[in-house]
């Protein structure tokens, strides 16, 4: 009897493997951090071989910890950091360059050049749902082809392959037999036409990217191929679900209905609203993306991305050394009644939605002689909630929907002070599920549905359960005063870097 699904969760700072049973309980988790490479100011890279070795290592480790063999595994689902770009040699399987990470800003100049062509810029937004930005994969691929010796010649001969991290992992798991992605990951490349559901020839021509490099685009839930976890002669396990991390979280939160909203507090913050079959073009700095692709049909989503969410807590711990453990931030923040007039704007890599300012930089405002470390810690936590409020306001305006309830997940969602402040500053109910590993759970759902482990979305939704509900409890005048202070602080940091 195949009792389990394994979700591979390949994130920005670590690779994880999580085993779920049929009742959606977590049997075991393994995690391994890997190296962050910063070769130049604003550049961020990963070693693709280390992404693979760390991910495969935790897969083997989690099975050993749980004492299960491949005979017990119904399927594997994959979820991944999105936009991160890997180009490798089709014949040798060797990457031609490090993975260029979604946070990397090296292609800002390429983007500025493209933006000068207003018609092209509008075309990109209209057809990919995205705005021209260094965040997405397209200009990263172009950079590799233009800057790695011999890469363009090889690409034009059909010898190089491109993939986001999901594609790379499937390629490696199937020993180079399968080169695929899913609708959600394709929609983050800035090369995929989300209306026609195909790679966009006009954008490929403009960026001089050969079509032969690109993977085949599949549903988010289907059997893509098989991997043999037991070596030669072992049982082949289907790889059966795949979606970008934020779309997996939306699915894992059972946001199946139009108008449902989730916010993930990871390295960044990512607010997504399921818009069903409607492509809503944002006028407020959000992007339109594919929420999920099932049985050849897609649902769309509005998305707002904050570059630095939970990462501000790591900064408080690692750089400022104000705490030794990220979990201690709540304890210290509670030692003061309010932020003491202090605001932290964590624009370390620029500002994401709704501002999209690559040249903004971080700052602390409102310091007085009475400000202490607890005020700064509290202000850093509050910054996560303020940035999420920015996204919620933009989403309300774009969608015309009143948002009364947000499902939350990710590491920082375990911080009760932050979640209560999130409810207070937005005036919305904040709901945290029992399982906050919703990204991995979404990947497990997708894989499980493909192989009949779970029969339907309805069966999945019945088992989803709530741990905590935070209701707004802040005076309206105070809410306005606090948020106005945030908006003043954000104005000050914009355009800082020349």
UniProtKB/Swiss-Prot annotation:
Activated by phosphorylation and inhibited by fructose 1,6-bisphosphate (FBP). Key enzyme in the regulation of glycerol uptake and metabolism. Catalyzes the phosphorylation of glycerol to yield sn-glycerol 3-phosphate. ATP binds at residues 12-14, 267, 310, 314, 411. GO terms for molecular function: ATP binding; glycerol kinase activity. The keyword Iron-sulfur does not apply. Disulfide bonds: none annotated. InterPro entries: ATPase_NBD, Carb_kinase_FGGY, Carb_kinase_FGGY_CS, FGGY_C, FGGY_N, Glycerol_kin. Signal peptide: none annotated. ADP binds at residues 12, 16, 267, 310, 411, 415. It comes from Clostridium acetobutylicum (strain ATCC 824 / DSM 792 / JCM 1419 / IAM 19013 / LMG 5710 / NBRC 13948 / NRRL B-527 / VKM B-1787 / 2291 / W). The lineage of its organism: Bacteria, Bacillati, Bacillota, Clostridia, Eubacteriales. PROSITE patterns: FGGY_KINASES_1, FGGY_KINASES_2. This is Glycerol kinase. It catalyses: glycerol + ATP = sn-glycerol 3-phosphate + ADP + H(+). Pathway: Polyol metabolism; glycerol degradation via glycerol kinase pathway; sn-glycerol 3-phosphate from glycerol: step 1/1. Homotetramer and homodimer (in equilibrium). One of its GO terms (biological process) is glycerol-3-phosphate metabolic process. Belongs to the FGGY kinase family. Its EC number is 2.7.1.30. It holds the Pfam family FGGY_N. The keyword ATP-binding applies.
């Amino acid at each position: 009897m195949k009792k389990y699904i394994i979700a591979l969760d390949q994130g920005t700072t670590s690779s994880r493997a999580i085993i779920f049973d049929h009742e959606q309980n977590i049997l075991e988790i393994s995690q391994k951090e890997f190296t962050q490479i910063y070769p130049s100011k604003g550049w961020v890279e990963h070693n693709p071989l280390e992404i693979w070795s760390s991910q495969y290592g935790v897969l083997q480790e989690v099975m050993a910890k749980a004492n299960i063999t491949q005979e017990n595994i119904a399927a594997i689902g994959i979820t991944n950091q999105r936009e991160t770009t890997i180009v490798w040699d089709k014949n040798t399987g060797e990457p031609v360059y490090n993975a260029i990470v979604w946070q990397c800003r090296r292609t800002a100049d390429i983007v500025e050049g493209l933006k000068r062509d207003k018609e092209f810029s509008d075309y990109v937004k209209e057809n990919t749902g995205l705005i021209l930005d260094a965040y997405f994969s397209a200009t990263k691929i172009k950079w590799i082809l233009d800057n790695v010796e011999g890469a363009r010649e090889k690409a034009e001969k059909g010898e190089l392959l491109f993939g986001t991290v999901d594609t790379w992992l499937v390629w490696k798991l199937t020993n180079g037999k399968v080169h695929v992605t899913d609708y959600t990951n394709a929609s983050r490349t800035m090369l995929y036409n989300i209306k026609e559901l195909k790679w966009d020839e006009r954008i490929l021509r403009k960026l001089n990217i050969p079509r032969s490099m690109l993977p085949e685009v599949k549903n988010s839930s289907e059997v893509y191929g098989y991997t043999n976890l037991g070596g030669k002669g072992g049982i082949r396990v289907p790889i059966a679900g795949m979606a970008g991390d934020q779309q997996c979280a939306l699915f894992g939160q059972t946001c199946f209905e139009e108008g449902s909203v989730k916010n993930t507090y990871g390295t960044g913050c990512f607010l997504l609203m399921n818009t069903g079959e409607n492509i809503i073009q944002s006028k407020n700095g959000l992007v339109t993306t594919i929420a999920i692709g099932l049985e050849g049909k897609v649902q769309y989503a509005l998305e707002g991305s904050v570059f630095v969410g939970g990462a501000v807590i790591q900064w408080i711990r690692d750089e400022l050394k104000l705490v030794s453990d990220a979990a201690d931030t709540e304890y210290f923040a509670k030692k003061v009644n309010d932020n003491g007039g202090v605001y932290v704007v964590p624009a370390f890599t620029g500002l994401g939605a709704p501002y999209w300012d690559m040249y903004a930089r971080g700052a602390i405002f409102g310091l007085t002689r009475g400000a202490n470390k607890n005020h700064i810690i509290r202000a850093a936590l509050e910054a996560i909630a303020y940035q999420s409020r920015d996204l919620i306001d933009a989403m309300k305006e774009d969608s015309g929907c009143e948002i009364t309830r947000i499902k939350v997940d990710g590491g920082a969602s375990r911080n009760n002070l932050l979640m209560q402040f999130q409810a207070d500053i937005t005036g919305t109910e904040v709901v945290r599920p029992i399982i906050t590993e919703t990204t991995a759970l979404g990947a497990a759902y997708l894989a499980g549905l493909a192989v009949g482990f779970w029969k339907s979305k309805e069966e999945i939704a019945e088992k989803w359960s709530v741990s905590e509900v935070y209701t707004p409890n802040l005076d309206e005048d105070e809410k306005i005063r606090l948020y106005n202070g945030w908006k003043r602080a954000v104005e000050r940091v914009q355009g800082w870097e020349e």
